């Protein structure tokens, strides 16, 4: 869904200039996304396009979900005193741009040109990824890595927070494969694994963002 303002000529010129400079850095499947959707407007569900808009400062600040999520995290965790790992940071590190330099970014498909000012790991995250250097693991729509973040963080006694996407990665034995069932499954996994020493919560974006998917957080009990 398009939720941003109608693009001005200046906005379109910025996008065209971006495409001329950086289009070749994107993999084929994301080039197709840019071809089809770059000029449609800011959305409630397309990170590739939204990250470009934020990078170019043509996003509507009051519906920028990355900034909302950052402020949400600030209200729950003492971010200044934490080493943070962001999983699935995407092609352009928009969420990370709101943090101080205490954040490391991980994404197998990140575009290194946009990450030169950050510590980053161009690799996938799984349940066995070494997170010993971090206090908090976060992800904004990390898709397939979502369950691994929860399991890995709880196993290693780390705080975690994930803004969930609308995909579904339920184990194959589940027949009702919807985003809602996936979110319920993740919450159940988190509460079962963290029952002894975690406060697990599920929250939602404000209505103006038109994002139905929840945010799941796990904070260690002190």
At which residue positions do the language-model features occur?
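S-adenosyl-L-methionine
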Residues: 2-79, 94
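Hydrophobic, Leu/Ile/Phe/Ala-enriched alpha-helical segments that form helix-helix packing faces
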Residues: 19-23, 73-77, 96-99, 153, ...
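Short, composition-biased local secondary-structure segments
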Residues: 60-71, 114-128
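Amphipathic coiled-coil/heptad-repeat helices and related helical stalk/stem segments
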Residues: 66-69, 89, 145-146
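Alpha-helix C-terminal capping segments
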Residues: 73, 77, 96-99, 115, ...
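Nucleotide donor/acceptor-binding cores
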Residues: 82
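SAM cofactor-binding core of SAM-dependent methyltransferases
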Residues: 86-125
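Domain-level detector for long C-terminal conserved domains
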Residues: 109, 117-222
